[in-house]
Amino acid sequence: MDIFLAILPAIFWGSIVLFNVKLGGGPYSQTLGTTFGALIFSIVVYIFMKPVLTPTVIGVGIVSGLFWALGQANQLKSIDLMGVSRTMPISTGLQLVATTLFGVIVFHEWSTTISVVLGVLALVCIIIGVILTSLQSEEEKNAEQAGNFKRGIIILLISTVGYLVYVVVIRLFNVDGWSALLPQAVGMVLGGILLTFKHHPFNKYAIRNIIPGLIWAAGNMFLFISQPRVGVATSFSLSQMGIIISTLGGILILGERKTKRQLTGIVVGIVFIIAAGIMLGIAKS
């Protein structure tokens, strides 16, 4: 039962972008709707959990949420250019590299020889995985498609910065996840509005995309529940499995076309990235 709870965040988070794309509306309406969904869920959780909200918790939570919105909005922009099945493995890989290097440099996480070896191997696996999942078909090598890929990668780098700050600012100030949940959601909504209001995102698609926001917040809740039961290392490793759902879902559910060579690269690349996530989880423990 505990392992099942620990897998739920991966299932929920892995399906979010599939819902975003299926529900439609483009990256701006998708971002805004998702943030409002997260806020609704967080208000309900706050009513039942009643965590203590200090000025530090509120401030840190809002900043974290603002940067989450930056990460999510740019990830959805990249999906608009490159598709789910290409964007998500690269995005996951970049996030793992960024959070790992920050953890090593700032928090000195790799304190033993084994953790250093596992960490370095994990980073190598991530690089290999990202390269394999980025393979282009001959058709995609034309000027327009190549331009979309380059723009998509640049946008993903911005997205990675957003997701990195979203994660590490909570840890830097040692804020409890349950306490940060509501302020975080407020920051997400503020960030979503600031990043999208020029593009007139307030439409029926924004309302539809409240659903992915509810799903994201539910995944967050199950992560908080599972961590004390299975440990941070195991829950972190299992949460990376969402890449399987999002990537294969992009191909099988959204109908993104891939050549046999690309499919092979994606499957093998996912294996490398998941292996890296597991190794990083062990290195953290």
Swiss-Prot record:
Residues that span the membrane, as ranges: 4-21, 26-48, 52-71, 84-106, 110-132, 153-175, 180-197, 210-227, 232-254, 266-283
Cellular location(s): Cell membrane
InterPro entries cross-referenced by the UniProt entry: Sugar_transport
Bilayer disposition of the protein: Multi-pass membrane protein
Alphabetical list of CDD domains matching this protein: glucose_uptake_GlcU
One Pfam match: Sugar_transport
GO CC term, one of those recorded: plasma membrane
Domain of life assignment: Bacteria
Keywords recorded for this protein, A-Z: Cell membrane, Membrane, Sugar transport, Transmembrane, Transmembrane helix, Transport
Primary residence: membrane
Membrane among keywords: yes
Function noted in UniProt: Involved in the uptake of glucose.
Family under the similarity heading: Belongs to the GRP transporter (TC 2.A.7.5) family.
The protein's name in its UniProt record: Probable glucose uptake protein GlcU
Lineage of source species: Bacteria, Bacillati, Bacillota, Bacilli, Bacillales
Gene from which the chain derives: glcU
